[in-house]
């Protein structure tokens, strides 16, 4: 367990006393929020103080406790892909390829609706409450999936699991963006999103063991695989007890003193002391606090004030969602139906695939903060699309073996993984704080709904034809979407690297 360096464990109930002491000790400091004659207007340096911090144990704990969402999602998606053969062989479920695609689409449909519903709540009631609610839903639904008795029940529980994960994406992306200093934001976001593939590797290993008929019966292995995910999620509850509410969210929503106390504690954790204004003249912003942001203002912000940014986010999300979900959800079917790989051996092929996906963000991520968003998003989307078209052609003419096909996927997704992560980075940093979570939810939902839900079902149907040329046509569609997204990024992407969130997108509550 992480050492307790600040006030967010069992001391949470004493926060009001802490705030009073903090205000008493630092009330004369210019870093404290200053109220004007209008009690709803404040001047604060909280964003500048958060961005001024060096990387510390606090930030590492935030990344571990919140970033594990992507590990859970990777575990879920990999199990869904690796277990497809086992579900077809299950004496209870007896799935067809269409049933596999349908269940995977149910998971993504749940993620779409969960992102929208929980995204709205995240902006309204706060980040911290939501990342406990969504985790609870994920745990319950994943455990229930292990008890499925029919195609319908399995699809329903996968839908609910997806809803939990979709909600996690909105709450977690918002919180990480708002707590991580600006100069680390791009690399951190990409690596956290890339940690999806650590979960994928875990799922692959679990599938290898749990699907071995010599060890576990054909109708029990896949059930134990889902219980593995639920058990992992229990650990996350403890880890998240130490994570505070976003100070940026608090300062907007009428709780500036609590936000100031939290930043004081973060500074003590990172620096061993609270920074004072005389040591560093932080820029301040003037804000008019609000309880919530009306949906009409949200819609106007996204589709009028930030229409061009919305278009960029939508294109990037649709392209990467179709590209990723269509290929990865049907990964096992390609290996079993076209290359004759036994379903209990698919996990071995996922491991190198997962390695390429994790190494991409890890090795290329820093370039998003140095060379910049526009250059790197264009490069990764464009290269991914071209490589998929080339490998798809080689697949169609039968020039690839199971091993060389896996190597091709590994190289493709070395570039596609940071591209997909950059889509989330783009939509989470280029909109105002008050609508950030809902913006993430909306573009994730639309992108996944169009690209993700359709993709697995389409590829499942293409694979069922038994025609390599039909599958190649699907690959060409995914490649074309990525190339189009690359062109859009080159023309319209925002240069948000190393800039504060408030300078990239001014808060709606900002006052001159």
Please place each PLM-identified region on the residue numbering.
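Transmembrane-helix signature of 12-pass secondary carriers
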Residues: 2-8, 12-512
């Amino acid at each position: 367990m992480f050492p307790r360096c600040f006030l967010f464990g069992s001391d949470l109930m004493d926060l009001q006393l802490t705030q009073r002491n903090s205000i008493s000790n630092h009330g004369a400091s210019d870093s404290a929020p200053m109220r004007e004659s209008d009690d709803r207007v404040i001047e604060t340096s909280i964003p500048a103080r958060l961005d001024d911090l060096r990387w510390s144990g606090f930030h590492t704990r935030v990344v571990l406790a919140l970033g594990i969402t992507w590990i859970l999602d990777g575990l879920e998606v990999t199990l869904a892909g690796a277990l497809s053969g086992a579900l077809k062989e299950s004496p209870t479920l007896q799935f067809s390829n269409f049933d596999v695609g349908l269940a995977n689409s149910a998971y993504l449909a749940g993620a779409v609706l969960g992102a929208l519903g929980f995204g709205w709540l995240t902006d309204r009631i706060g980040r911290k409450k939501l990342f406990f609610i969504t985790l609870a839903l994920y745990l319950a639904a994943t455990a229930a999936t292990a008890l499925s008795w029919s195609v319908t029940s399995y699809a329903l529980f996968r839908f609910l699991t997806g809803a939990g994960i979709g909600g996690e994406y909105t709450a977690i992306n918002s919180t990480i963006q708002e707590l991580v200093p600006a100069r680390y934001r791009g690399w951190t976001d990409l690596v956290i999103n890339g940690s999806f593939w650590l979960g994928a590797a875990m799922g692959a290993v679990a599938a290898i063991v749990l699907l071995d008929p010599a060890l576990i019966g054909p109708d029990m292995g896949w059930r134990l695989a889902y219980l593995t995910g639920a058990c992992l999620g229990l650990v996350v509850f403890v880890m998240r007890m130490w994570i505070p509410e976003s100070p940026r969210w608090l300062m907007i929503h009428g709780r500036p003193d609590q936000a100031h106390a939290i930043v004081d504690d973060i500074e003590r954790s990172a620096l061993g002391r609270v920074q004072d204004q005389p040591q560093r003249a932080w820029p301040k912003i003037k804000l008019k606090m609000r309880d919530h942001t009306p949906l009409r203002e949200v819609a106007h912000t996204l589709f009028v004030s930030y229409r061009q940014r919305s278009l960029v986010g939508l294109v990037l999300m649709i392209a990467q969602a179709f590209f990723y979900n269509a290929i990865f959800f049907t990964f096992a079917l390609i290996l079993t139906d076209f290359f004759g790989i036994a379903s209990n051996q698919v996990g071995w092929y996922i491991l190198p695939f997962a390695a390429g996906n994790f190494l991409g963000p890890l090795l290329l991520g820093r370039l998003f903060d140095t060379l910049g968003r526009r250059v790197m998003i264009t490069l990764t989307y464009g290269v991914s699309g071209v490589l998929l078209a080339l490998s798809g052609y080689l697949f169609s003419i039968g020039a690839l073996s199971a091993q060389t096909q896996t190597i091709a996927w590994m190289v493709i997704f070395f570039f596609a993984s940071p591209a997909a992560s950059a889509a989330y980075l783009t939509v989470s940093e280029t909109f105002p704080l008050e609508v950030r979570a809902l913006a993430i939810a909306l573009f994730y939902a639309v992108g996944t709904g169009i690209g993700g839900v359709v993709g697995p079902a389409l590829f499942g149907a293409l694979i069922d034809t038994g025609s390599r040329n039909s599958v190649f046509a699907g690959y060409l569609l995914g490649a074309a979407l990525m190339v189009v997204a690359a062109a859009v990024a080159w023309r319209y992407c925002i240069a948000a690297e190393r800039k504060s969130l408030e300078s990239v997108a001014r808060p709606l509550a900002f006052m001159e």
